[in-house]
């Protein structure tokens, strides 16, 4: 402790030369190094990343750190070649499908004297925020040094999601290439220099492609963004004031707007861009084509009448698709008023934006089910049809008893109900009111009786339907046999007439030969 408590007064008061305490950076450095370091003064140590070390060396080495005693590699400025390589890497990562080199369609040449960028008013941060993007900062600094840029103002709108960085440049008289890239790669404008221009004329800028791609980015701040800022960040609005153009562009003379689209865009993107442009111009009308949806179905009675009017045609509708007047089946009465009922009509119409009218009309007619029954009177195919319009009615049968709600006294059940209760293993209730279990069991066996009646009715109708089909088949077979006989007779008659015709022609030809 005495060594640390003591001061260095004795050393400083000694007669040592002050120059000898200073270390020379040039010729005295070799005294501090080992012999192996004298041979190679720049020692480079390579080590893996910590993440690679944690993966037990299974993954390839992504980056190697370089430590040098003579220079700091990370602080060196990027050369123009390395900057160009970084820019190409940015293009490959941000636009893997379309590269600026291959996307040559839709190229437009614009004089920068008449090019002005107007950006919507947003919360701009100072130019010091530009340092947060190293690649953008380096490229802008390189452009400033190489081209002598007179004025470059960088504004970065700060949104809650932090998903966009916009660079606004006032382009004046300079002729060197400029590459401006957004931080989120949402838009890319690459400009090239035309070397054949004279020094006093501004260089032309060729816009290879301008693509906008909205992607969700990780938020920079914990505070949520306001709706207005999100709306402004989702759209990159560029207003181009163009006085002279050297190629054809697509204009919309009605609204005096400019629409720039690539040739590979679909019709949906074109309509969306037009709608967005109209919203920017303050128009709320949407471009929608006139659309009408109409669904109509005719009743089964018309088709059955048409089939009966002719001797043969489509057979009758199966009874399984027609409800019964004395059975419920599987279709509840509420289904009759469904939107796709036989007599339902649905009409939806959307008018033009100019008219400003839109109407939706849904109309339904009262649901009615028709039943058609026909019987054959003779073998010639004459038939009569009768159409009866009925509605669904619940099953009322003497096999099922009914008690008014809240009644008391002795419970009277039918023989069918008692037999079904015993068959199912339920006790027969005797008094009212019923318990929960008795009500449940009674409902179950009554439903079973109704299902049995409905099944019997459907089997009866199916049998009648099959009998009608069999009779119609017999009639059609008989008619077909008669027609075949008539056809054979007509063929024989035709053959006889042809033979007579040939004979007459031969006689006429002989008579003409004799006259000649």
Swiss-Prot record:
Signal sequence bounds: none
CDD domains per the UniProt record, alphabetical: bZIP_CREB3
One record GO biological process: regulation of mitochondrial transcription
InterPro entries in alphabetical order: bZIP, bZIP_sf
Stretch list, region Disordered: 213-237, 294-338, 353-408
Annotated localization: Nucleus
Superkingdom of this protein's organism: Eukaryota
Location, primary (coarse class): nucleus
Modification Phosphoserine occurs at: 75, 79, 82
Spans annotated as Leucine-zipper: 469-476
Tissue: In all cell types examined, including developing salivary gland in embryos and in adults, brain and optic lobe cell bodies, salivary gland, midgut epithelial cells of the cardia, female ovarian columnar follicle cells and male seminal vesicle, ejaculatory duct, and ejaculatory bulb.
Region described as Basic motif: spans on this chain: 443-463
One Pfam family here: bZIP_1
Molecular-function GO terms, alphabetical: cAMP response element binding; chromatin binding; cis-regulatory region sequence-specific DNA binding; DNA binding; DNA-binding transcription factor activity; DNA-binding transcription factor activity, RNA polymerase II-specific; sequence-specific DNA binding
Family: Belongs to the bZIP family.
Subunit organization: May bind DNA as heterodimers with other bZIP proteins.
UniProt protein name: Cyclic AMP response element-binding protein A
